[in-house]
Amino acid sequence: MRSTSKAIPFSFHTSLIVQCLRPLRFTSAASPSSSSSSSSQWFGFLRNAITSSDLMLGKCTHARILTFEENPERFLINNLISMYSKCGSLTYARRVFDKMPDRDLVSWNSILAAYAQSSECVVENIQQAFLLFRILRQDVVYTSRMTLSPMLKLCLHSGYVWASESFHGYACKIGLDGDEFVAGALVNIYLKFGKVKEGKVLFEEMPYRDVVLWNLMLKAYLEMGFKEEAIDLSSAFHSSGLNPNEITLRLLARISGDDSDAGQVKSFANGNDASSVSEIIFRNKGLSEYLHSGQYSALLKCFADMVESDVECDQVTFILMLATAVKVDSLALGQQVHCMALKLGLDLMLTVSNSLINMYCKLRKFGFARTVFDNMSERDLISWNSVIAGIAQNGLEVEAVCLFMQLLRCGLKPDQYTMTSVLKAASSLPEGLSLSKQVHVHAIKINNVSDSFVSTALIDAYSRNRCMKEAEILFERHNFDLVAWNAMMAGYTQSHDGHKTLKLFALMHKQGERSDDFTLATVFKTCGFLFAINQGKQVHAYAIKSGYDLDLWVSSGILDMYVKCGDMSAAQFAFDSIPVPDDVAWTTMISGCIENGEEERAFHVFSQMRLMGVLPDEFTIATLAKASSCLTALEQGRQIHANALKLNCTNDPFVGTSLVDMYAKCGSIDDAYCLFKRIEMMNITAWNAMLVGLAQHGEGKETLQLFKQMKSLGIKPDKVTFIGVLSACSHSGLVSEAYKHMRSMHGDYGIKPEIEHYSCLADALGRAGLVKQAENLIESMSMEASASMYRTLLAACRVQGDTETGKRVATKLLELEPLDSSAYVLLSNMYAAASKWDEMKLARTMMKGHKVKKDPGFSWIEVKNKIHIFVVDDRSNRQTELIYRKVKDMIRDIKQEGYVPETDFTLVDVEEEEKERALYYHSEKLAVAFGLLSTPPSTPIRVIKNLRVCGDCHNAMKYIAKVYNREIVLRDANRFHRFKDGICSCGDYW
């Protein structure tokens, strides 16, 4: 016995166990809140009928249910089956079962239990039960111990040895051969059928053996005349630490040769008389029944009574209580039980230590689990398996692999459970493929690679690491269950070989294997990235037919598939079909709207989400920030930022970066920079967002300064970083700086320049007036120039008046994109600026000949959360007269300040006065006039234009900002322009 004075990790309070009753008072199966059915009046009547075995009361209750319940709940019907079974009416139980519209595993377990409990265990009934079990295997993929228990009982009644062996094999296949109840029943069957050798093997493999099983083995040895084996077993029983009951004492007396006197062996009772042994057995039996029926409040009360009554607990008590702590998710209870075990010295027992490891792992306290494991004086394979599995399942893969290597060094032979756990851990690591292959070699060495669990785990490991050839070799060698099929399909999907996923799915159904939620979710994901909407619709129909469309995981997969395929109508239907969408489903719908260009709808969905009381997560916030960026809706973006602050997720790198990008793209670069400085965990994406934002706003020097700061902090730039840096050089006319960073990109960081980087450099040359150098750069590139590069160069030719180079560039641009309207427009603008009206008309004629229409230019402004759109000479606004009057006032005021209309931007050959008038009512001027009328003085006016701002409007904006003392932020197709005090942030480089 361990000294009670030893320091223990937790303080022990018996009262805490009693306190655990309060939060769990309604968690038992009989409590009102345990299900919707149990709160009804019918459940109480059924319980009374079962308790009193009153068939008449049960029938009357059934009749009332049929009268008053149009669609009785499945839980209630299951209890009807149990009632008829307990009251001895198998016929009525079967009738209720046959009429059930849909059945779950509990329904099947109930009817099988009815056959097993029937006093009429005739051959016909046994055969009917076996037939039901075969049907069950077709309808339900997974079964439980509650399914096997009645089947094993029927095997015992029937005397069918072959059936018992078949169920034993099935138990091994589904991993229940180690279950104490299933294994115990199998031991009992083998012993009753005289197969003592088989019973002994199974008995010795069991992780926990109660006194009843020991009694069965002792009795079998005695009845078969194996007295030496019985003596050895009695010694082993003494070493186990279990307390014998009265039956044990009689059997031990028979071994000693005196059936009438058990005094010679009473020392096995450890100083307790038979009555005290019977008391603890009775108490443990009650605890076990409460545990398996889910009546945790009653169990805790029973245990508290044991403690207060000074009933000495044994290892079985502690194993049951530790299992209870896991069931009710109570670390406090688990620690108190651990404390009691320490005080009584029972934590030294192997089975108790193993249960402690299991409890701490299930409650995610891996440090405690490892401490228990490290302090064990004796460990068996179950100890190793428990700690490896617990650690592997909760993200500590490296530690799990190290423990596996330590196990091998100890000379222990891993079993299928060890191998599956370590394979799961190894395959998740960066070096997962190499480790998985080493484990595979060891599995071959110890000859357990043929085990279905190990083979399936190997398939999963290879699939995770996209080594599908190795997975295929394993898969083709055996007839696998659904788990292996799922692993293969998931592997193909992860390897971007979706066509094989769909082929395997079709083959699986052809061979009669039924899908589960994981299968369907994988297939929908595959259909999404393949844009295979027709196949997706077929699988959707199958999901509806099989009832999986109501599964949240599957329904989210259906929604995501339609979103990725661009069918938002079908996506909306799928979303509306989800009974209670979670945050993932809402976010999928929101991001789908954004991906398909329906940003305003995304905000509408978000409003519905908040009305439903669903809190957005970090991904939702980041997605909505992106929507604000696309709409350049600053006010909505600010609201999203406010939501992020309320949810305390602004420190999330993903959210912070998205908000920085949103403010930058909405024209509020100061807000973007303030938020950027407050991000605590800054990654390269955040730096890139800020660099690109500054570049778009023409803050070239600030961009380069920030880039220098980033490098000083040891953050390595990537290709996106250099796009921002080169863009800043381009917009600020820093040609030499652009060349310098282009060389540094490849020489210092090993980043090969791509088309986007060359585009920025060519743009920098064009804006600086070095049009021919830009043309030479494009011609000298090793890669083919893009249409956007030629488009940028053509715009530069228009600004510089280089019609000769512009003509060559336009020819190459039209070869790449003959239907690009901007090419014709830029060409005609270039000729108009040079007063070459005949060439301009020819360009327009070419445009008409190719039936190309010019993209209409328009500008918009957001006022009071409403978007107002304007086109040239627009008179659709209800305030048109006021707006046009304001434009006239603006032109008058800025002319007095020195503004001179740049009539070169007029594309018609008319009188100068007409040219001026044509410039006055460009869309951006109308939008600014509306902004002056509709926004408070001194507040910034933010205007967005879909095309590049014309030179005259750009010049006019500088004067308007100065005369009216307003900051004007104008975002065109190329960049941001911030007009303040008569100066633009672009420095006239645009």
Swiss-Prot record:
<dbReference type="InterPro" id="IPR002885">
    <property type="entry name" value="Pentatricopeptide_rpt"/>
</dbReference>
<feature type="repeat" description="PPR 11">
    <location>
        <begin position="451"/>
        <end position="477"/>
    </location>
</feature>
<dbReference type="GO" id="GO:0003723">
    <property type="term" value="F:RNA binding"/>
</dbReference>
<dbReference type="Pfam" id="PF01535">
    <property type="entry name" value="PPR"/>
</dbReference>
<feature type="repeat" description="PPR 15">
    <location>
        <begin position="582"/>
        <end position="616"/>
    </location>
</feature>
<protein>
    <recommendedName>
        <fullName>Pentatricopeptide repeat-containing protein At4g33170</fullName>
    </recommendedName>
</protein>
<dbReference type="GO" id="GO:0008270">
    <property type="term" value="F:zinc ion binding"/>
</dbReference>
<feature type="repeat" description="PPR 19">
    <location>
        <begin position="718"/>
        <end position="753"/>
    </location>
</feature>
<feature type="repeat" description="PPR 10">
    <location>
        <begin position="415"/>
        <end position="450"/>
    </location>
</feature>
<dbReference type="Pfam" id="PF20431">
    <property type="entry name" value="E_motif"/>
</dbReference>
<feature type="repeat" description="PPR 1">
    <location>
        <begin position="73"/>
        <end position="107"/>
    </location>
</feature>
<feature type="region of interest" description="Type DYW motif">
    <location>
        <begin position="896"/>
        <end position="990"/>
    </location>
</feature>
<feature type="region of interest" description="Type E(+) motif">
    <location>
        <begin position="865"/>
        <end position="895"/>
    </location>
</feature>
<feature type="repeat" description="PPR 16">
    <location>
        <begin position="617"/>
        <end position="651"/>
    </location>
</feature>
<feature type="repeat" description="PPR 3">
    <location>
        <begin position="144"/>
        <end position="178"/>
    </location>
</feature>
<dbReference type="InterPro" id="IPR032867">
    <property type="entry name" value="DYW_dom"/>
</dbReference>
<feature type="repeat" description="PPR 14">
    <location>
        <begin position="551"/>
        <end position="581"/>
    </location>
</feature>
<comment type="similarity">
    <text>Belongs to the PPR family. PCMP-H subfamily.</text>
</comment>
<feature type="repeat" description="PPR 17">
    <location>
        <begin position="652"/>
        <end position="682"/>
    </location>
</feature>
<dbReference type="InterPro" id="IPR046960">
    <property type="entry name" value="PPR_At4g14850-like_plant"/>
</dbReference>
<feature type="repeat" description="PPR 13">
    <location>
        <begin position="516"/>
        <end position="550"/>
    </location>
</feature>
<feature type="repeat" description="PPR 18">
    <location>
        <begin position="683"/>
        <end position="717"/>
    </location>
</feature>
<dbReference type="InterPro" id="IPR011990">
    <property type="entry name" value="TPR-like_helical_dom_sf"/>
</dbReference>
<feature type="repeat" description="PPR 5">
    <location>
        <begin position="210"/>
        <end position="244"/>
    </location>
</feature>
<feature type="repeat" description="PPR 12">
    <location>
        <begin position="481"/>
        <end position="515"/>
    </location>
</feature>
<feature type="repeat" description="PPR 4">
    <location>
        <begin position="179"/>
        <end position="209"/>
    </location>
</feature>
<dbReference type="InterPro" id="IPR046848">
    <property type="entry name" value="E_motif"/>
</dbReference>
<feature type="repeat" description="PPR 8">
    <location>
        <begin position="349"/>
        <end position="379"/>
    </location>
</feature>
<keyword id="KW-0677">Repeat</keyword>
<feature type="repeat" description="PPR 9">
    <location>
        <begin position="380"/>
        <end position="414"/>
    </location>
</feature>
<dbReference type="Pfam" id="PF14432">
    <property type="entry name" value="DYW_deaminase"/>
</dbReference>
<dbReference type="Pfam" id="PF13041">
    <property type="entry name" value="PPR_2"/>
</dbReference>
<feature type="repeat" description="PPR 7">
    <location>
        <begin position="314"/>
        <end position="348"/>
    </location>
</feature>
<feature type="region of interest" description="Type E motif">
    <location>
        <begin position="789"/>
        <end position="864"/>
    </location>
</feature>
<feature type="repeat" description="PPR 20">
    <location>
        <begin position="754"/>
        <end position="788"/>
    </location>
</feature>
<dbReference type="GO" id="GO:0009451">
    <property type="term" value="P:RNA modification"/>
</dbReference>
<feature type="repeat" description="PPR 6">
    <location>
        <begin position="279"/>
        <end position="313"/>
    </location>
</feature>
<feature type="repeat" description="PPR 2">
    <location>
        <begin position="109"/>
        <end position="139"/>
    </location>
</feature>
